[in-house]
């Protein structure tokens, strides 16, 4: 996400087993890393491999979507984590996932436009087994982060679009990883999928418009 000063904030999904930390990276316009911010102890103590899947900026606050439940989350709840770039304070809210069927349910993106934060929520299934590939939104006014280590408020979500009809439109199978969403200055929404390489799939990647996001 843009930092408002010509650079970018990036979310790094780590893997402790491979000695790759979760965290935030602040880079300049050339992509040079100028600052690295690791997780605070309250988050690090409960992390799992499925970490930050997107970052969005609202004023001085960065919001990150955590893909799946961490060890301190109630079942069916994932964190939207907040980091204040001016004060260095961390916080979070809980986001309620859709009921889980086969596989797992999680978040794959967060982006901000107007008065809302938009997230992609999906299962990890393909083809006929895929049930949830959706865009939801949360009111920015409801994103009031609580202190880590205690009870977190649960935000209300509103469904914006079911993406499965879009994913079926090409006549192929429904792909798994819907992982990117952006809204341009005219209000048009764009979605992109991640093929994770081509070793065990067709390698198909989709990039498409969902039209005006009202």
Tell where the protein language model's regions lie, with residue ranges.
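Sequence/structural signature of beta-propeller domains
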Residues: 1-214
């Amino acid at each position: 996400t843009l930092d408002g000063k010509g650079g970018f904030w990036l979310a790094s999904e780590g893997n402790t087993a491979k000695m790759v930390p979760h965290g935030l990276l602040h880079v300049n316009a050339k992509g040079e890393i100028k600052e690295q911010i690791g997780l605070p102890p309250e988050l690090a103590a409960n992390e799992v491999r499925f970490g930050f899947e997107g970052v969005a900026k609202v004023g001085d606050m960065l919001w990150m979507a955590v893909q799946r439940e961490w060890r301190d989350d109630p079942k069916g709840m994932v964190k939207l984590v907040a980091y204040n770039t001016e004060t260095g304070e961390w916080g979070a809210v809980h986001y309620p996932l859709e009921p889980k069927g086969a596989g797992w349910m999680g978040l794959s993106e967060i982006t901000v436009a107007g008065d809302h934060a938009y997230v992609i929520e999906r299962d990890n299934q393909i083809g006929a087994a895929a049930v949830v590939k959706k865009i939801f939104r949360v009111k920015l006014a409801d994103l009031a982060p609580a202190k880590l280590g205690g009870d977190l408020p649960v935000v209300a979500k509103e469904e914006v679009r079911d993406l499965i009809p879009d994913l079926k439109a090409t006549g192929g199978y429904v792909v798994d990883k819907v992982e990117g969403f952006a809204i341009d200055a005219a209000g048009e929404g764009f979605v992109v999928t991640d093929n994770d390489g081509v070793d065990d799939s067709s390698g198909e990647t989709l990039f498409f418009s969902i039209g005006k996001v009202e």
